[in-house]
């Protein structure tokens, strides 16, 4: 059936445009003359459509293009306030903090001078002037506005064929499932063999931060490490009590005294003393998996009194609703004694838990200014009732470090590691960038973590990694020596779909791969390819040509979900799962595989007294990752993680110099880059390159660390698709310290399509590849009025076609025919 698609971005006058069509089965495609628009179309199999981009404004200003749109939306919607996150030069927050705090009705909610971070809220009517004044300060590097990032649905149910039948190609996983298995395929990164070869380097001694939707404290596989220590050592909430509209934070503004008091028409008893009181309604969690039923009794109407003793730092929750706090145990924040409360009463005779665990947390002196009115200039303490928002965080935690899944030998990647849970997601289906920024800062600077996994992100209009949050993440890595591992996003299979903040320069961004065995075991799906990328996995490069994803790891797993939810297998797999276990998919599942595997390397290095810095860890991983047959560099990055080879590189002294790269970028919006027309990798999408033509590019490389002399480097193209790229002249270059050197490379594609390769710049005297530079060119087919193609594609795969769209075209139609009955093929 013909289909007309509207543009994602406005046409750019005078520029040629390339449209990409991705299809997923045998087909014939016909295109009517199309408007100048990049088109990304979904592939067969599990996936998520890429969101429509906003119009892109200038990215040269300190307020990003997305953020300028957010400000316009706030004005149009009549929002009372806007909140901004500001990256300043480290140690230079005082000036902008004072400036914003002085705005009438404005307040500074958080500042970290060492890192260079300020979060402030100002009235929307004063936002333009406040932002303009802040942007004029040389100490201010970037400004992001608060927004909520949707949490992708990791369940594959939306992609299942209607009426599909269970095939039961594999039995259900259980207590007898071995450590090496296709259900939770940690063995594909080398994690299972590594633990077998190094049993004391199973993650012990390492603490992993999980910035997500919260981790279930009641799951049996998340109770103990392999050495019998507590698995979850801290549990906090990263959202802001006011600006994130998270009502699990209760304002302690009503003072009362024991032994008796009245609050909201109810009489209460309490031990003698001075307190503050509030109420917690289970309906506050309506947007999460609990659907507002915190105590699992089938309704959403329950309310509990909350009593706060500021002097003691304790909280009592009237769980039995007898209005007497005297029989409720005073609770401290989880890290101070690991106290857990429960909403509801469990029936041990059932598979599912009829209760939900919670913890408490206290945040002191929160500015109340965003509430306006009489609250301006005041501060208050808040108490958080810490419950999980969804299954997402628990599943991520299990993949990372579960110990004894199903009570057997099946584990997460690093079963000996400890965990810290930080909930950054709210009750409206997403996580705010404020919580994701401040939660990350809190985990790295205050919670004693050695590595952090964050499986949350979104595709911005300009995904070049040039924003305040990306800069702050890079600083956290450099300043505190903690590696951040982040999911690449689920907006594939198109190129240039990497999400933010996986764009940040020094994070490990992780794409999702899958084996033939996992397709069969977890989905009941029979495929021919032995190993491939997940169709939904976001692909590189960044808009500035940057190297993303960093690498890939398995992106589907059966693992832990909250124990108060029933088992959640894929129906077509043909088996059931017990409560507390589910099959989820996404780069959200790939990232914790990588984080857990990296934790094994940190564990081994710690035992061997090896100083494994984030830079060394990244060098070892990217230098040893395995290429996936038939997968291009822009899709897989360095390839499939291989920690056994990475460990060999670490023991051999893996190290690398630092470099900057300036390479030409020709895209529809390259004028919006930090340096218009240039980026950190070669990316030619709009340059008109044709099959059979040759085009030479100049890539400038500057070595910024190491000896103050010229050092010989070898140049080599790896994963060179179709042999499209070659080095012009010598394959060796001498790089002095801090002096740019230009290297010429040539693209000579033999056929249409996207071609990519990794230019390796390597000092042969160092262990590992020193620098990898992604090269990507797009060769489109000419289009006068129509374009037709015929072919076949394997199940759960995709086929890409690029066409040159005539200037001035207003519409694009794609007609697809020749499909088999009940085919799920789509474009």
Task: Provide a role label for each language-model segment.
Residues 56-78, 123-132, 153-210, 214-228, ...:
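N-terminal domain-start motif of subtilase-like serine proteases
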Residues 195-287, 291-295, 299-312, 320, ...:
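Subtilisin-like serine protease catalytic core
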Residues 699, 753-765:
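A short beta-strand micro-motif common to beta-rich folds, especially ectodomain repeats
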Residues 1-197, 778-783:
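Autoinhibitory N-terminal propeptides
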Residues 355-373, 381, 502-595, 599:
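Extracellular S/T/G-rich loop segment that most often corresponds to the catalytic His/Ser-adjacent loop
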Residues 233-241, 449-560, 623:
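Catalytic-core segments of hydrolase enzymes
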Residues 489, 643-747, 769-823:
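Secreted peptidase-domain scaffold signal
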Residues 397-400, 420-426, 450, 497-500, ...:
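Hydrolase catalytic cores
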């Amino acid at each position: 059936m013909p289909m007309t698609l509207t543009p994602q971005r406005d046409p750019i006058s005078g520029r040629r445009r390339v449209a990409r069509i991705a299809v997923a089965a045998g087909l014939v495609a016909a295109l009517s003359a199309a408007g100048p628009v990049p088109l990304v179309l979904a592939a067969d199999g599990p996936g998520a459509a890429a969101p429509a981009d906003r119009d892109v404004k200038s990215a040269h200003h300190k307020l990003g293009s997305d953020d300028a749109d957010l400000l316009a939306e706030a004005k149009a919607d009549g929002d009372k306030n806007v909140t901004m996150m500001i990256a300043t030069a480290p140690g230079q927050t005082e000036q902008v903090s004072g400036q914003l705090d002085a705005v009438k009705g404005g307040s500074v909610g958080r500042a970290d001078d060492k890192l260079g971070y300020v979060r402030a809220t100002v009235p929307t009517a004063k936002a333009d002037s406040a932002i303009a004044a802040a942007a004029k300060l040389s100490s201010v590097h970037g400004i992001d506005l608060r927004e909520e990032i949707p949490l992708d649905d990791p369940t594959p149910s939306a992609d299942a064929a209607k009426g599909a039948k269970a095939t039961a190609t594999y039995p259900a996983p259980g207590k007898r499932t071995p450590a090496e298995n296709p259900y939770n395929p940690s063995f594909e990164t080398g994690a299972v063999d590594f633990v077998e070869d190094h049993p004391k380097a199973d993650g012990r001694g390492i603490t992993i931060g999980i910035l997500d939707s919260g981790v279930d404290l009641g799951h049996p596989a998340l109770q103990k490490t392999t050495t019998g220590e507590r698995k979850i050592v801290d549990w906090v909430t990263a959202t802001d009590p006011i600006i994130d509209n998270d009502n699990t934070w209760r304002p302690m503004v009503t003072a009362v005294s024991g032994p008796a008091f009245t609050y909201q028409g109810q009489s209460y008893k309490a031990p003698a003393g001075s307190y503050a009181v509030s109420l917690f309604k289970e309906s506050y969690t309506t947007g999460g998996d609990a659907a507002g039923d915190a105590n699992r009794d089938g309704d959403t109407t329950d309310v509990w009194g909350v009593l706060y003793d500021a002097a003691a730092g304790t909280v009592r929750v009237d769980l039995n609703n007898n209005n007497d706090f005297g029989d409720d145990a005073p609770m401290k924040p989880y890290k101070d004694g690991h106290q857990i409360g429960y909403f509801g009463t469990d029936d041990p005779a059932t598979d599912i838990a009829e209760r939900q665990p919670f913890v408490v947390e206290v945040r002191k002196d929160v500015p109340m200014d965003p509430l306006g009115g009489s609250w301006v200039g005041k501060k208050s303490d808040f108490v958080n009732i810490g419950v999980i928002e969804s299954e997402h965080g628990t599943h991520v935690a299990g993949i990372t470090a579960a110990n004894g899944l199903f009570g057997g030998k099946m584990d997460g990647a690093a079963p000996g590691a400890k965990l810290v849970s930080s909930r950054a997601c709210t009750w409206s289906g997403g996580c705010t960038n404020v919580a994701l920024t401040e939660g990350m800062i809190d985990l790295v600077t205050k919670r004693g973590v050695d590595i952090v996994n964050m499986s949350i992100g979104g595709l911005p209009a300009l995904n070049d990694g040039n924003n305040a949050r990306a800069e702050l993440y890079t600083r956290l890595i450099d300043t505190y020596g903690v590696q951040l591992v982040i999911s690449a996003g689920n907006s594939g299979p198109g190129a240039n779909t990497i999400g933010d903040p996986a764009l940040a320069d020094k994070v490990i961004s992780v794409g999702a791969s899958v084996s033939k065995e996992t397709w069969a075991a977890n989905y009941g799906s029979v495929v021919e390819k032995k190993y491939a990328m997940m169709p939904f996995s976001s692909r590189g490069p960044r808009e500035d040509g940057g190297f993303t994803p960093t690498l890939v790891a398995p992106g589907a797993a059966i693992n832990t979900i909250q124990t108060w939810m029933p088992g959640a297998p894929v129906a077509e797999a043909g088996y059931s799962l017990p409560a507390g276990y589910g099959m989820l998919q996404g780069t959200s599942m790939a990232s914790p595989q990588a984080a857990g595997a990296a934790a094994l390397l940190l564990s081994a290095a710690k035992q061997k007294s090896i100083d494994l810095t984030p830079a060394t860890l990244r060098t070892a991983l990217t230098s040893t990752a395995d290429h996936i047959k038939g997968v291009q560099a822009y899709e897989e990055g360095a390839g499939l993680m291989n920690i056994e080879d990475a460990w060999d590189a670490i023991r051999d002294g893996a190290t690398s110099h630092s470099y900057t790269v300036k390479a030409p970028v020709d895209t529809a919006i390259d004028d919006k880059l930090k340096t218009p027309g240039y980026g950190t990798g070669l990316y030619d999408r709009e340059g008109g390159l044709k099959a059979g033509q040759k085009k030479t590019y100049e890539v400038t490389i500057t070595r910024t660390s190491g000896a103050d002399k010229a050092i010989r480097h070898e140049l080599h193209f790896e994963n060179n698709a179709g042999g499209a790229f070659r080095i012009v002249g010598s394959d060796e270059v001498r790089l002095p310290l801090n002096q740019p050197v230009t290297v010429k490379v040539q693209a000579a594609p033999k056929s249409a399509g996207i071609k990519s390769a990794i230019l390796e710049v390597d000092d042969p005297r160092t262990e590992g590849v020193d620098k990898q530079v992604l090269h990507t060119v797009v060769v489109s087919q000419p289009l006068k009025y129509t374009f037709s193609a015929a072919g076949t594609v394997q199940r759960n795969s995709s086929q890409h076609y690029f066409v040159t769209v005539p200037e001035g075209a207003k519409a694009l139609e794609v007609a697809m025919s020749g499909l088999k009955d009940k085919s799920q093929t789509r474009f």
